[in-house]
Amino acid sequence: MELKLLQDNGQLGAGVAASPEVFGRDYNEALVHQVVVAYQANARSGNRKQKDREEVKHTTKKPWRQKGTGRARAGMSSSPLWRGGGRIFPNSPEENFSQKVNKKMYRAGMRSIYSQLAREGRINVVDSLSVDAPKTKLLADKFRAMGLDSVLVITDNLDENLFLASRNLAHVLVVEPRHADPLSLVHYKKVLVTKAAVAQIEELLK
């Protein structure tokens, strides 16, 4: 199969050969969903904190004597049963949200995503991508000429100028093939891959 070559003026050129084992697979929606959700979960860090009965600032004095008042017995006012008391199972920043996806499933999910992008015409190949200086304007003008506004760039050689020029563009992400993740692939409207990076992707996902 072939991926379309995107020229600097935004026109599509001749096709570039690509492996059908990576870019020609059937779309497995359930697997892609599982891989994306697992990626998001593994990137998540806990930021919720609630107090249990030990952490609540209350006196430990017994509110009233054990027997003889007619009330239910009570040990301390920090009890989870009381208003203002601690939580029984409080949320903690140390919670583990990670989900396990084995390598075989992850690679199959990535192949499915790349294949769907190829079918939808959202992935194109460029000979190379570089800028002469680490200037955001240079890269922004290049993408504007190509008709791109939201783009994930997968390059075989992430040089410093390209990285620095892309860093201040809100809807542009430049990565190497081994750092391309499922969430970014489905998030951006277009995916640009350099010719050399196509071979690297095929090697990673074979």
Curated annotation (Swiss-Prot):
One of its GO terms (cellular component) is ribosome. Residues 49-58 have a biased composition (Basic and acidic residues). Pfam families: Ribosomal_L4 (PF00573). GO terms for biological process: translation. Residues 59-70 have a biased composition (Basic residues). The keyword rRNA-binding applies. Keywords: Ribonucleoprotein, Ribosomal protein, RNA-binding, rRNA-binding. GO terms for molecular function: rRNA binding; structural constituent of ribosome. Residues 43-78 are annotated as: Disordered. One of the primary rRNA binding proteins, this protein initially binds near the 5'-end of the 23S rRNA. It is important during the early stages of 50S assembly. It makes multiple contacts with different domains of the 23S rRNA in the assembled 50S subunit and ribosome. Forms part of the polypeptide exit tunnel. HAMAP family: Ribosomal_uL4_B. Belongs to the universal ribosomal protein uL4 family. Part of the 50S ribosomal subunit. This is Large ribosomal subunit protein uL4.
